């Protein structure tokens, strides 16, 4: 009983809802064998002949190509295309292709040389010796795609199936009227088709392989049964003729009883389907090593005098094929690529044959009938009864016409297979399929725009996040940079304090000076002698020109003479009235060093600077002021106790004085000489002498005030500065 049930289950077929029975019109073309078409002089090969992106070009204009040579590289879902014949690439430009709107796509245009030479072909006769991955890659690189109409890359489809495929279905139904390409291919090439099916089964390793064919193809059924007479791995299932039983979901339900869920694929239920033409192309790619460069195309219709099925090279213009079949166009002739229900009308005949082209229908006016006017929907539900996908075409029509995309999506418009059964039975002659195609295209465009917007938003948010991270990092760097200098300053302050403490500690140490001993200044003396020798060497290397020696400055000489006389008188008075003060060796050494430095500086200035003009008036004034201050200092006398002498500090100060003196020796300058007016100088000298006498009289009559040597020195310096400024102003006025 169980065996009987299994046998019944093995040969059982199911049915699907809906469907129609239009006139088949297949006898026009299925009675003649396949034939070759003469080569066209020019071929147009679109880069995209499948679902997915176009491949990357690997040829350029002017290249010579052979038949089967790859024109593009296939990576991922990109499927390569190959040259249909040998010739020369004359252009790579957009060209109208097989599309309802005749959209222009990038194409390679080849001028045939008539030789039709193949590339070197390498077949895998023992395909079982190769791995599954190698077979899939070969199928993909040889450009095999679904030849039943979808054009999905076969290699990608096989790769996606993986190990979850339990049933492999070969679609041989070919249910649409007029089309007999698969029927004729099964009659003439049944053995090659079965070999291709076994290659697919070897790759997928399914539990069962089923061939579904309609009962209106008796010759093809007999040929397949003859080839499968001794085969137990492939089952042939003959199904009733009903349109659209050749749809993937419908044939799956007929052969397995399983329904593909809404929005899903047949692989979700463990089923993978391939067309008989695809199986034949797989055999030629794997066993013969031939890329897909041609396919079977049905040429039919009453406008064609010699209908039949031909081997058409990919890229052949439609006009060339129809002319070879005896095309006799009428005034308003239409040409349909595909069948009368799922095909589309070509805007012109220069479009090329591609991988999904299975039929070229050229009907007469009487054959297609007069065009009828579209009327309003009467909601008769005939379209819903005929729909094989269990949809509501009348609702989808209203949603599509009203641009209600969300409702159309909710009513599963994506599951529409565009079979045309609803439009066939519509009494109002509404082209429902055209509305559904347009609505699905608009929905796809909206989804694509939403995807692009989401990607743009993601990029913007990523950019904003990156900018925020960079800003935070920049602020952190600024904060660390602001903290680091403070730490460095603290370190510097601490180091300075340490040095001060060290100096204070050294200063507090007692200095022991033995009686009658002198400080050891040998190191300082040696350094001084070395510097003197270095200075003498520099002077010898740079001798001073004798012509640059200027005359003495009478103003400075008078001031210094007056100061010297005042100091001399003061010393005489102190020597006569006060006891002698002890001599401070440190101060004496400092003063001597300063005197030597001044002397050297004057020598260098005399050697490098031009003589300055002497202002006798100001010189006399300064001399008188100096003499008055000297007399005041003479009248002042006092005594201060002698300070203790620190020999170490005296030596340090003497060394510092000598260093300053040498530094002043190295500095040189030059000032331009100012002109002297003898007449004005004599007048100013007389005025100065009068002022000096007046100051002497005032000094003799007024009581003497205590003199401050520091203020006297400051006053003398101010007098010298004013004298220089007055001389400069005089020169400006004279100019």
Swiss-Prot record:
Please provide the Gene Ontology terms (biological process) for this protein.
electron transport chain
Membrane spanning stretches? none
Record EC number: 7.-.-.-
How the cofactor binds, per note?
Binds 2 [4Fe-4S] clusters per subunit.
Gene3D superfamilies, per database record: 3.30.70.20, NADH-ubiquinone oxidoreductase 51kDa subunit
State its location(s).
Cell inner membrane
Q: Name one GO molecular function term.
A: electron transfer activity
Instruction: Identify the cofactor(s).
Output: [4Fe-4S] cluster
Q: What class of enzyme is it?
A: translocase
| Cystine pairs | none
For this protein, the record's PANTHER family field holds:
ION-TRANSLOCATING OXIDOREDUCTASE COMPLEX SUBUNIT C
Function, as annotated, reads: Part of a membrane-bound complex that couples electron transfer with translocation of ions across the membrane. Required to maintain the reduced state of SoxR.
Q: How does it assemble?
A: The complex is composed of six subunits: RsxA, RsxB, RsxC, RsxD, RsxE and RsxG.
Query: Of which family is this protein a member?
Result: Belongs to the 4Fe4S bacterial-type ferredoxin family. RnfC subfamily.
Tell me the protein's name: Ion-translocating oxidoreductase complex subunit C
- Please report the organism this UniProt entry assigns to the protein: Salmonella heidelberg (strain SL476)
Q: What is the lineage of its organism?
A: Bacteria, Pseudomonadati, Pseudomonadota, Gammaproteobacteria, Enterobacterales
The gene that this protein is the product of is rsxC
């Amino acid at each position: 009983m169980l065996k009987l049930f299994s046998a019944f289950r093995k040969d059982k077929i199911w049915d699907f809802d809906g469907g129609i029975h239009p006139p088949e019109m297949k006898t026009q073309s299925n009675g003649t064998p396949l034939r070759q078409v003469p080569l066209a002089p020019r071929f147009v090969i679109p880069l995209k002949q499948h679902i997915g992106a176009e491949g990357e070009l690997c040829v350029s204009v002017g290249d010579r190509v052979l038949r089967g040579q790859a024109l593009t590289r296939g990576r991922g879902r990109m499927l390569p295309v190959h040259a249909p014949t040998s010739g020369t690439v004359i252009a790579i430009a957009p060209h109208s292709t097989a599309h309802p709107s005749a959209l222009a796509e990038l194409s390679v245009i080849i001028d045939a040389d008539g030789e039709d030479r193949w590339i070197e072909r390498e077949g895998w006769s023992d395909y079982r010796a190769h791995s599954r991955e190698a077979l899939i890659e070969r199928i993909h690189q040889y450009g095999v795609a679904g030849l039943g109409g979808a054009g999905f890359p076969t290699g990608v489809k096989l790769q996606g199936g993986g190990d979850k495929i339990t049933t492999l279905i070969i679609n041989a139904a070919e249910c649409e009227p007029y089309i007999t390409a698969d029927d004729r291919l099964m009659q003439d090439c049944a053995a090659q088709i079965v070999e291709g099916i076994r290659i697919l089964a070897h790759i997928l390793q399914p539990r069962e392989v089923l061939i579904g064919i309609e009962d209106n193809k008796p010759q093809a059924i007999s040929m397949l049964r003859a080839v499968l007479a001794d085969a137990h791995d492939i089952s042939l299932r003959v199904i009733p003729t009903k349109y659209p039983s050749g749809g993937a979901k419908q044939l799956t339900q007929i052969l397995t009883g399983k329904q593909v869920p809404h929005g899903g694929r047949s692989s979700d239920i463990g089923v993978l389907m391939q067309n008989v033409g695809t199986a034949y192309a797989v055999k030629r790619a794997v066993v013969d090593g031939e890329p897909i460069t041609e396919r079977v195309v049905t040429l039919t219709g009453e406008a064609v005098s010699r209908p039949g099925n031909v081997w058409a090279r990919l890229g052949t213009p439609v006009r060339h094929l129809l002319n070879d079949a005896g095309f006799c166009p009428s005034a308003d002739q239409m040409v349909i690529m595909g069948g009368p229900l799922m095909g589309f009308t070509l805007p012109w005949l220069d479009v090329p044959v591609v991988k999904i082209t299975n039929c070229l229908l050229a009907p007469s006016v009487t054959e297609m009938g007069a065009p009828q006017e579209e009327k309003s929907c009467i909601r008769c539900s005939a379209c819903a009864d005929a729909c094989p996908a269990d949809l509501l075409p009348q609702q989808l029509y209203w949603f599509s016409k009203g641009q209600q995309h969300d409702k159309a999506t909710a009513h599963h418009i994506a599951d529409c297979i565009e079979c045309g059964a609803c439009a066939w039975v519509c009494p109002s002659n509404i082209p429902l399929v055209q509305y559904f195609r347009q609505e699905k295209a608009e929905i796809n465009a909206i989804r694509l725009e939403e995807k692009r917007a989401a990607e743009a938003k993601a990029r913007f948010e990523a950019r904003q996040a990156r900018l925020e991270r960079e800003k935070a990092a920049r602020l952190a760097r600024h904060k660390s940079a602001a903290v680091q200098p403070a730490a460095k300053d603290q370190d510097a302050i601490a180091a300075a304090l340490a040095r001060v403490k060290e100096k204070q500690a050294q200063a507090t140490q007692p200095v022991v000076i033995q009686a009658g001993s002198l400080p050891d200044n040998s190191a300082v003396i040696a350094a001084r002698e070395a510097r003197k020798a270095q200075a003498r060497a520099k002077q010898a290397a740079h001798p001073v020109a004798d012509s640059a020696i200027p005359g003495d400055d009478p103003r400075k000489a008078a001031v210094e003479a007056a100061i010297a006389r005042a100091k001399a008188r003061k010393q005489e008075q102190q020597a006569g009235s006060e006891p002698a003060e002890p001599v401070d060796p440190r101060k004496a050494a400092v003063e001597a060093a300063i005197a030597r430095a001044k002397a050297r500086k004057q020598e260098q200035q005399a050697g490098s600077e031009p003589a300055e003009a002497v202002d006798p008036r100001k010189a006399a004034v300064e001399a008188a002021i100096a003499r008055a201050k000297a007399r005041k200092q003479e009248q002042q006398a006092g005594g201060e106790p002698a300070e203790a002498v620190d020999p170490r500090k005296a030596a340090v100060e003497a060394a510092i004085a000598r260093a300053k003196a040498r530094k002043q020796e190295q500095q040189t300058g030059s000032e331009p000489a100012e002109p002297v007016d003898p007449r004005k100088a004599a007048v100013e000298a007389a005025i100065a002498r009068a002022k000096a006498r007046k100051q002497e009289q005032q000094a003799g009559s007024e009581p003497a005030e205590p003199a401050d040597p520091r203020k006297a020195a400051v006053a003398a310096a101010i007098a010298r500065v004013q004298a220089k400024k007055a001389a400069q102003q005089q020169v400006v006025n004279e100019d």
